Amino acid sequence: MAFSDLTSRTVHLYDNWIKDADPRVEDWLLMSSPLPQTILLGFYVYFVTSLGPKLMENRKPFELKKAMITYNFFIVLFSVYMCYEFVMSGWGIGYSFRCDIVDYSRSPTALRMARTCWLYYFSKFIELLDTIFFVLRKKNSQVTFLHVFHHTIMPWTWWFGVKFAAGGLGTFHALLNTAVHVVMYSYYGLSALGPAYQKYLWWKKYLTSLQLVQFVIVAIHISQFFFMEDCKYQFPVFACIIMSYSFMFLLLFLHFWYRAYTKGQRLPKTVKNGTCKNKDN
C-alpha cells in the first residue's frame, strides 16, 4: 500500500511538473519523456567505464583514423551550422544579451530557435563518440571523470532546457559552445590527419585557455540575471543551473590546467595514430 501511494504521488508530481512543458517540442525525437535519454546515457557510462574496456581487453585496438577524421570535421560543420542558427534565430537579430525571455509562439523565428536548441541537444549524443573512440582504440586513460561527467551531464540537463525553455538567455552558453567547438574539433580533425600536419597545430596549448575563457564569459553573462529586478525570464532555475555549471567546469578545467601545465604533469602528446588526448569538452 505504501509503495502504491508513493507511486501515485510521484505520478501526480510529474503530471503537475510536465504541464509547464513547451507543447511545440512534445513530438520531437527523445522529447516525450526524460526516461529514454536516461537509459541511453546510463548505458553509455556503463559501456565506456566497464563493458567496453572488458570487451577490448584481449583484442587489438581498432584503427579508426578515417572514421575519426570524418567524425571530427562533421562536428566542425555541424557546429558552424548550429552557431549560425543560434545567431539567426535570436542572438544576432534582436536578443539584448541581458534579459532575453523565451518566445513560446509559433512564429518562424521562435520555432527556428526551438529547433536549433533541439539540434544542439541531439549533437551531445553524437559527441558521445568521442569516448567510444577512446575505448575502441584502448585509450582508457583518456576516459577520465571530467570527460565522462561532461559528456553525460550536458545532454541530460539539456533535455530539460529544450522541454521547458527553448530560447532566451539560457541558450547563450550553447551559442558560445558551438563556436568553441568549431575551433576544437578543427584541431582534432587536423590532428587525426597525421604527423604531416603537426606544424600547423602550434596553437594546441591555447585550447584549454579557450575553454576556460568560455566558462568565464558564460558565468559573467548569466550572472546578470541575478542583478536585474525586473527580468521576466520564465525559468530562473535554469539560470541557477547554468551559473553552477559554469563555475563547476571552470574549477575542473583549472584543476586540469594546473595538473597538466603548472605542475608539469602534462598528459601524453596529442597526436598518436591520429587521436587527440585532451578532448574533455
Swiss-Prot record:
A motif (HxxHH motif) lies at residues 147-151. Keywords: Acetylation, Disulfide bond, Endoplasmic reticulum, Fatty acid biosynthesis, Fatty acid metabolism, Lipid biosynthesis, Lipid metabolism, Membrane, Transferase, Transmembrane, Transmembrane helix. Expressed in most tissues except heart and skeletal muscle. It catalyses: a very-long-chain acyl-CoA + malonyl-CoA + H(+) = a very-long-chain 3-oxoacyl-CoA + CO2 + CoA; eicosanoyl-CoA + malonyl-CoA + H(+) = 3-oxodocosanoyl-CoA + CO2 + CoA; (5Z,8Z,11Z,14Z)-eicosatetraenoyl-CoA + malonyl-CoA + H(+) = (7Z,10Z,13Z,16Z)-3-oxodocosatetraenoyl-CoA + CO2 + CoA; (6Z,9Z,12Z)-octadecatrienoyl-CoA + malonyl-CoA + H(+) = (8Z,11Z,14Z)-3-oxoeicosatrienoyl-CoA + CO2 + CoA. Residues 2-27, 94-115, 163-171, 228-236 are lumenal. The keyword Signal does not apply. The modification N-acetylalanine is found at residue 2. Its EC number is 2.3.1.199. 3-oxoeicosanoyl-CoA binds at residues 124, 137, 139, 142, 147, 187, 204, 208, 211, 266. Residues 49-72, 137-142, 195-206, 258-281 are cytoplasmic. GO terms for cellular component: endoplasmic reticulum; endoplasmic reticulum membrane. The active site is at 150 (nucleophile). InterPro entries: ELO_CS (IPR030457), ELO_fam (IPR002076), ELOVL7 (IPR033670). HAMAP family: VLCF_elongase_7. Catalyzes the first and rate-limiting reaction of the four reactions that constitute the long-chain fatty acids elongation cycle. This endoplasmic reticulum-bound enzymatic process allows the addition of 2 carbons to the chain of long- and very long-chain fatty acids (VLCFAs) per cycle. Condensing enzyme with higher activity toward C18 acyl-CoAs, especially C18:3(n-3) acyl-CoAs and C18:3(n-6)-CoAs. Also active toward C20:4-, C18:0-, C18:1-, C18:2- and C16:0-CoAs, and weakly toward C20:0-CoA. Little or no activity toward C22:0-, C24:0-, or C26:0-CoAs. Homodimer. Interacts with TECR. The C-terminal di-lysine motif may confer endoplasmic reticulum localization. Belongs to the ELO family. ELOVL7 subfamily. This is Very long chain fatty acid elongase 7. It comes from Homo sapiens (Human). The gene is ELOVL7.
